[in-house]
Every structure is written in structure tokens, then in C-alpha cells.
Amino acid sequence: MGNAILTSCQYQNYRRIDLIVIHCSATRATQRYTVDDCRRDHRARGFADIGYHYYITRDGVVHAGRALYQVGAHATGYNEHSIGVCYEGGLDIRGRPCDTRTPEQKETLQKLLERLKEDYPEAKVVGHRDLPGVKKDCPCYKV
């Protein structure tokens, strides 16, 4: 599917969307963590599928996660009215929080957010850490 998502009309959604929540996978800059790895780990935690609606790998490819009509599993207490977007990375080589987004990820994320804002103009874009009650560094950069 790849970046065709950015130009296709797959955004029909009947859920009210108030937030677009940006996440990182909390993996080291040197660690490969594919969308399939994320999906496997989320299912192992008891989720029905990957918790995010979109996942952006280091090469800048955006992968579809949960369908937008489905409630995500990415931000406890905020899932019902939000869309979850995750990028691969978020930790430096020592495992400390760090903005490890590649230029390709930054470009893809910007395009995806522009597209989502066209469909959900009232939605606020926030980092996971910006949500009240969240004690994480995710997405490891200022949104």
C-alpha cells in the first residue's frame, strides 16, 4: 500500500475526531522495527491489531494500521476520538529519548498530517506526551 495512502480517499470516517496523536515506536535508532513487528507486539499484548492507524518506517513509507473507522489502541482515555500515527524510532543508540526521525519520515509525516487535517480540520495535532496524565517522552520531539 505504501505512500499511495497519502493521495487516496481512504479517510471516510464516521467517528468524531478531536485529536491526531503522534507517537514513536520507542526503538533505538539502529533497530529495525517494521509495521509487522509492531502489529505482532501489539497482538501479543492482547490488542485486536496494531494500535495505530498509521505507521511510518525509517524509509518514509506510511503503512496502514487500523482502519480509521476503528477505535485505536494508542492513547488510553483518548482513543475513541483520535487517530494514532507512529514513526519508527524515538530512542538514540543508548536507549534515551531522542528525535530520530529521518528526513524521509519528517516529509511523509508532514504530508500525512496535511491530508488528515483536510479531512479533520478541527482535530488538534499533539504528541502522546502532551496528553494530560501521560508520563512518557513519546514522540521524543516537540509537536
Q: Could you describe each region identified by the protein language model?
A:
Residues 37-45, 112-119:
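Structured segments of extracytoplasmic/periplasmic soluble domains
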Residues 75-77:
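Short, charge-rich binding segments
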